[in-house]
Amino acid sequence: MGQSHTHDHHHDGYQAPPEDIALRVKALESLLIEKGLVDPAAMDLVVQTYEHKVGPRNGAKVVAKAWVDPAYKARLLADATAAIAELGFSGVQGEDMVILENTPAVHNVFVCTLCSCYPWPTLGLPPAWYKAAAYRSRMVSDPRGVLAEFGLVIPANKEIRVWDTTAELRYMVLPERPGTEAYSEEQLAELVTRDSMIGTGLPTQPTPSH
């Protein structure tokens, strides 16, 4: 009722290397910490910076430009990979992008049910909860309930579409623009949150002073 699940998850041929690389990185990290060459707190800070600030700021610029530039938005919806590359954001985990536009009638959210595929060039590193089995399974079976746990209550008359990322394809949500007619593109980008581009949140509402 008011929700659908787009399951197009072709992980055939999705080999072990990503997991192998992750294990090697973890082993190297443990060795460096053990030898006192790396401060674990400092490493956590770097990860948090890329997870919350550096990566998502790229996506925020894409969203803000789409909000203010109808021609760019049209290109973004038609060929997201090329339109995102126009702003200089491309690379590993972002070779084939699709933009999911939220509307007054439809709210989009994406998940990777089999692993943790995520659009690194625009959103940075995936948050821990995105990789968790609970999110990956429950977002498909009970999206409305899971979104409510994130503090995002979707009206019953609004359709929720859950998109399952593939090994080849990466999604990013284009959230609805808040009431910000007087905002510049740069100001709008500051309102775009990482979670609003995943679909588990909304953009920050503008302050009354604006």
Curated annotation (Swiss-Prot):
NHase catalyzes the hydration of various nitrile compounds to the corresponding amides. Industrial production of acrylamide is now being developed using some of the enzymes of this class. Keywords: Cobalt, Lyase, Metal-binding. Coiled coil: none annotated. Its EC number is 4.2.1.84. Belongs to the nitrile hydratase subunit alpha family. Heterodimer of an alpha and a beta chain. Co(3+) binds at residues 112, 115-117. Binds 1 Co(3+) ion per subunit. It comes from the Bacteria. It catalyses: an aliphatic primary amide = an aliphatic nitrile + H2O. GO terms for molecular function: nitrile hydratase activity; transition metal ion binding. The gene is nthA. This is Nitrile hydratase subunit alpha. Its cofactor is Co(3+). InterPro entries: CN_Hdrase_a/SCN_Hdrase_g_sf, CN_Hdrtase_a/SCN_Hdrlase_g, CN_Hdrtase_asu/SCN_Hdrlase_gsu, Nitrile_hydratase_asu. It comes from Pseudomonas putida (Arthrobacter siderocapsulatus).
